Every structure is written in structure tokens, then in C-alpha cells.
Amino acid sequence: MPIPWDELEIGTETGRVELTLTDEMIDEYLASMDSDHPWFAGAESPAGERTAPPDLVPKLAMTALFQDYIQRDIGPNIRAKQAFRFLAPVRSGMRVKAVGRLVEKYERRGKRFITLEALFTDEQGTPLVLDRRTQLVLSPDFQMPA
């Protein structure tokens, strides 16, 4: 059951994730994207070791960080915009963690929007990726046209 708009609190935790990035995760992602870029397919990256495609970790974590919360507490919605800031390479074998939060809610031209954000860090707390996404919140009785 969606939380009423007036009761949505800025700062609410939307989810958390902790994962260790493996070569297998990178390989599966590259295969799905039909990519063999040498920075990601081997150890030829400027970082000196195998790195993950920049958007891999946010995609792996999307459900735990945002989607479960949105489906449970927000209800029908459409992604309105999304932006990543890639701050440091994510390397194979790296342990990564993030906490998702509701950081903004607003109304524009009679429509309601929420913004969610997660900062991915390594075990030492080094910022790796900032994922920020805005969702258009649809009315609870919204139905897809047949």
C-alpha cells in the first residue's frame, strides 16, 4: 500500500546493498551488452587492472536500493530522469556498498516527483559512483491502457 504523499519523509532509507564484484559478473554484463571493450574484458584499463563498466554496479543494485521501495511504498511510477557520476573505477574483486535514500519530493505542473539517490563506496569509504534518479509518481488508481 503506497504511503500518502504528505507522509513521505526526505532522508528515508530506500534500501541497502553490499556486494563483491566478480569477473563472472563483468563477463555476464559484457555478454548482455555485446561488448568486448578491452578495459572491461581484460586487464588493459588505465587503472592497471580489470575494471567494471561504469554502470554495472548501479544496475546490479537497482532492485535492492530503489525498486523494492518504489513498488511497496510509492506505487505506480515512471522514471523521469537519471544521472550517474562516476567518481573512481570499480575493480573486479572489490567489495562495494551503498544505501539508497529519498532525497527530494516536489510537485511541478500538477504532477508529483520523487528523487532517490545512492552513493556507492568501497570498503575504505572511497566514493565510486553516485546514482540519482527521479520518478514521476502516478495516481494509485493508474491503469495501463489495454
Briefly describe each language-model feature range.
Residues 1-81, 142-146:
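Hot-dog-fold acyl-thioester-processing enzymes
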Residues 1-5, 86-146:
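HotDog/MaoC-like acyl-thioester-processing domains
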